[in-house]
Amino acid sequence: MSNKMWGGRFSERPDAIMEEINVSIDVDRHLYAQDIAASKAHAAMLAAQGIVTAKDAKNIAKGLDTILSEIVAGSFDFKRALEDIHMNVESRLSELIGPAAGRLHTARSRNDQVATDFRLFVRDTIDGIDAALASYQHALATRALEHADTVMPGFTHLQTAQPVTFGHHLMAYVEMAARDRGRFRDARKRLNESPLGAAALAGTSFPIDRDATAKALGFERPMANSLDAVSDRDFVLETLAAASIAAVHLSRFAEEIVLWTSPLVGMVRLSDKFTTGSSIMPQKRNPDAAELARAKTGRVIGALTGLLIVMKGLPLAYQKDMQEDKQGAMEAFAALSLAIRAMSGMVSDLVPDPARMKQAAGEGYATATDLADWLVRELKMPFRDAHHVTGRIVGEASKQGVALHELPLAEMQAIEPRITQQALSVLSVESSVKSRVSYGGTAPKNVRAQAKAWLKRLEKEHNSG
């Protein structure tokens, strides 16, 4: 005869392989806090509705508090034979308070129980990631303010395009992180409905109060359809999608740090705190923190893809396939959180080389667009014509092996006679960035204003709690 809590209709014990594939405690033990909180809310509701006695509910709550303390202290004995966190908690509760523990599962199934636990877990995770992203934004905006005037090359196709400031470049990632935070917050709003009380799939005949348990657990409302409540994993998928986009943003910046710190580029240096050495090459300083932050993206995207594939063919309602929803997601959320912290640390740590940045910003005829703009503005030339003229001037400078501002005025006038000495004034990288005063542009005064506004906004968020 089976000794499982669900084993009443079984006459044989499960095969060892069945037990091995069925067990989930190694993963869902991380839901212990959420499982205990949901059980306490459920017990209180059962008592309020007269389904269990107040005495039993009190003993259940006391026993659950004891279990929580044991788990936090590391003294709780998790048993793989009990399969999951729910049965481990219930078994220990039975040891502590006796038969009253068996009343806790009235009007509840593991189906709505695990759905509730995981929603609470993902909600807590979102709050933690949001706080980490806010710290990352603060680090970026702080350094952007410091380097609002530090000129560097802006790139398209990884070719020098136009001069920008280092502060402007950093502020781009502040904006990306803001959208990431918005996506996480949107996901949080949609997940914040309670499955508890949906039971196995059809609801329950007991006179439960789902609004009460939803409120007790901080949910906005109970989920409206019991089938949906136990079978939905949209909330994990949506959060993983937000995490994947955030990870891609981090990966793009991490890649830039790897490039910038290369001796071939040399625009930025990381301290020993965020680099490692080589076991054979004593001179090496490898940007491993950036490389690993970049690599974490694969784990996050992989978790999203994996769960999409798990869910794509599942009919309503709960299927055991859904047990595979947690490990990949938990690992992905942990990887993202670590990558955010690592990137925040590197942002605060990195030391730009303004001289090298300025030199690089002037290479590749990066101020050619400024000359074209001058032709449009001063000579009233159509932009397409100005583009063509400037292209010919760049070609001549390249042919002579000189920078654009080093090309003699006479050589420019041979291509366009109306060009004057004034045109040369727009060809410095400093004048180029200062001229980009349009909203969202790289002008230092814009960058300072944006960085200050973000720092003020983040401080207000922090103070409002």
Swiss-Prot record:
Its main location: cytoplasm. PROSITE patterns: FUMARATE_LYASES. It catalyses: 2-(N(omega)-L-arginino)succinate = fumarate + L-arginine. One of its GO terms (cellular component) is cytosol. It is found in: Cytoplasm. Pathway: Amino-acid biosynthesis; L-arginine biosynthesis; L-arginine from L-ornithine and carbamoyl phosphate: step 3/3. GO terms for biological process: arginine biosynthetic process via ornithine; L-arginine biosynthetic process. The keyword Hydrolase does not apply. Belongs to the lyase 1 family. Argininosuccinate lyase subfamily. This is Argininosuccinate lyase. It comes from Rhodopseudomonas palustris (strain BisB18).
